[in-house]
Amino acid sequence: MTRRYWNINLKEMIEAGVHFGHGIKKWNPKMAPYISAKRKGTHITNLARTTRFLSEACDLVFDAASQGKSFLIVGTKKRAADLVASAAIRARCHYVNKKWFSGMLTNWSITKTRLSQFRDLRAEEKMEKFHHLPKRDVAILKRKLSTLLRYLGGIKYMTRLPDIVIVLDQQKEYIALRECAILGIPTISLADTNCDPDLANISIPANDDTMTSIRLILNKLVFAICEGRSLYIRNH
């Protein structure tokens, strides 16, 4: 794996609140190696460990992107939905930012069928084929299209399982992580002090509740993906 310098700045992480964990009563003992202190009843994440694992994650996604691999970013918190979509679009990644449907990856044949329905309905709407149908049927089809767009819009171009999955909230996206583990898909996950670092291939110790923290980590990963994609384009 290529090791590169990703300009991960300690001051920047402190300003973003990356180091703030959960209350000490909510912690997961498996996170002990990644905690540096307790402050006013709250665990403080060791940012040296954050820097190390974020660098490793950036190296991994850079190498994968430079080989033309595909990525899926998963973050279904309401506050993070727009951030996930904009970051994924910027790096040309697939994304899920509304709801993770159980079996989205493990029952890939069903997901592919839904995506096919979605693409067909979009094509019919653009070709104005709905105009020839009764109003009631048009309303039903438009409602179905709207639902498919809301939940599958971020993976509408996905034709196969992703090569790497990035998860922004381990506890909220537990099912997604389990599906990746079953399928052997490498995962990168933020790991707050109440998380289990063993659930992902690379767990980045970081605050997964504050938008500034999530944005900083995601931006570093997206930058590394974009750099890798640029290298892939130059070589092909």
Curated annotation (Swiss-Prot):
It comes from the Eukaryota. SUPFAM superfamilies: Ribosomal protein S2 (SSF52313). Gene3D superfamilies: Glucose-6-phosphate isomerase like protein, domain 1, Helix hairpin bin. One of its GO terms (cellular component) is mitochondrial small ribosomal subunit. The keyword Chaperone does not apply. The keyword Chaperone does not apply. InterPro entries: Ribosomal_uS2, Ribosomal_uS2_bac/mit/plastid, Ribosomal_uS2_CS, Ribosomal_uS2_flav_dom_sf. One of its GO terms (molecular function) is structural constituent of ribosome. Its main location: plastid. GO terms for biological process: translation. Pfam families: Ribosomal_S2. It is found in: Plastid, Chloroplast. Keywords: Chloroplast, Plastid, Ribonucleoprotein, Ribosomal protein. Belongs to the universal ribosomal protein uS2 family. This is Small ribosomal subunit protein uS2c.
